């Protein structure tokens, strides 16, 4: 009996080991099957359309830099076959086919034979005809939301993740961004009310100067670092005159339009502004603070280090 029991134990152990090793080909097929089972997916996009993506996209065209950055951050960059001429990040996009700027080259997009086109809510009106032509050509178009807050940026990431079969990576990215943002908020808590600075954000240069008011992610970025938006009484993206800006008299000025600090300080009438008097005019990387994508937290850090160097610069 003991001998027979020993034989059965040996056979059982061998079976377990074989099951554990498995066939590599079978394991690969199993993983592919699991991914296939995710699709089709139906997503309620920013155009209020239920967009069904029947299978995992192999070719993706992005019509907005923020969409592109998200797609690459989710590990889907090898599937991107078309981007706009406005795309600058990551560096790999330089070699990707260009499909126009805000005006979509429909023929070019169709020639790339994409499984999925990532459009954007902010350009819905301008590209309405182009989007219709793409849909008429049988191409799946998903319109990503125009994010104006961190929570909406997270939604954009999750939407693209679901569309591309990268939901897990999207969840990980969102968690990482939230964690990094929390770290910044903790540092900002050390800034007292008396130390808080009013900040004017210039997103478009003179003669047509635009700034950011409330209900924008840039306003939220300032709130996170305990800075006061000098134009907080405005809503959205608004144009302001030189006289109005001088009257606001901000403690700091941040340009996101490529204009250098010295050029701002030389503007007529601006010498009376506190920010200019005390040389607190900063130019930051526009792509970090104006693109509603995965690098937005880096933008918050750059703003914080510029406005409160003693608190945030290590």
Curated annotation (Swiss-Prot):
Region forming the signal peptide: 1-20
UniProt domain Fe/B12 periplasmic-binding: residue ranges: 59-311
GO BP, one annotated term: cellular response to iron ion
InterPro entries, per database record: ABC_Transporter_SBP (IPR050902), ABC_transptr_periplasmic_BD (IPR002491), Vit_B12_bind_prot (IPR054828)
Chief location category: membrane
GO cellular component terms attached to this protein's record: plasma membrane
Protein's membrane topology: Lipid-anchor
Record lipid sites (S-diacylglycerol cysteine): 21
Complexes and interactors: The complex is composed of two ATP-binding proteins (YvrA), two transmembrane proteins (YvrB) and a solute-binding protein (YvrC).
NCBIfam families assigned to the protein according to its UniProt record, in alphabetical order: TroA_like
Purpose of the protein: Probably part of an ABC transporter complex.
Protein name, UniProt field: Uncharacterized ABC transporter substrate-binding lipoprotein YvrC
The organism of origin for this protein: Bacillus subtilis (strain 168)
């Amino acid at each position: 009996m003991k001998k027979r029991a020993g034989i059965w134990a040996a056979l059982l152990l061998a079976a377990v080991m074989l099951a554990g090793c498995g066939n590599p080909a079978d394991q690969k097929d199993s993983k592919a099957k699991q991914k296939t089972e995710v699709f089709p997916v139906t997503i309620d996009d920013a155009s209020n359309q239920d967009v069904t993506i029947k299978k995992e996209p192999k070719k993706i065209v992005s019509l907005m830099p923020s969409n592109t950055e998200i797609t690459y951050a989710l590990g889907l960059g090898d599937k991107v076959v078309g981007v706009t001429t406005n795309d600058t990040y990551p560096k790999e996009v330089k070699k990707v086919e260009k499909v126009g700027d805000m005006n979509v080259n429909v023929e070019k997009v169709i020639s790339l034979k994409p499984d999925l086109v990532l459009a954007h809510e902010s350009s819905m009106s301008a590209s309405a005809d182009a989007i219709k032509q793409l849909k008429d050509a049988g191409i799946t178009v998903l319109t990503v939301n125009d994010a104006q807050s961190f929570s909406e940026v997270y939604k954009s990431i999750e939407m693209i993740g679901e569309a591309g079969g990268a939901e897990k990576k999207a969840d990980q990215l969102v968690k990482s961004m939230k964690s990094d943002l929390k770290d910044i908020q903790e540092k900002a808590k050390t800034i007292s009310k008396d130390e808080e600075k009013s900040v004017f954000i210039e997103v478009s240069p003179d003669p047509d100067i635009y700034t950011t008011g409330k209900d924008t992610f840039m306003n939220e970025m300032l709130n996170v670092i305990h800075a006061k938006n000098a134009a907080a009484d405005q809503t959205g993206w608004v144009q302001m005159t030189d006289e109005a800006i001088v009257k606001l008299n901000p403690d700091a000025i941040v340009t996101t339009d490529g204009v250098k600090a010295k050029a701002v300080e030389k503007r007529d009438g601006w010498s009376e502004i506190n920010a200019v008097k005390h040389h607190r005019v900063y130019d930051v990387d526009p792509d970090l603070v104006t693109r509603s994508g995965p690098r937005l937290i880096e933008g918050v850090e750059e703003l914080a280090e510029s406005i409160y160097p003693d608190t945030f610069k290590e």
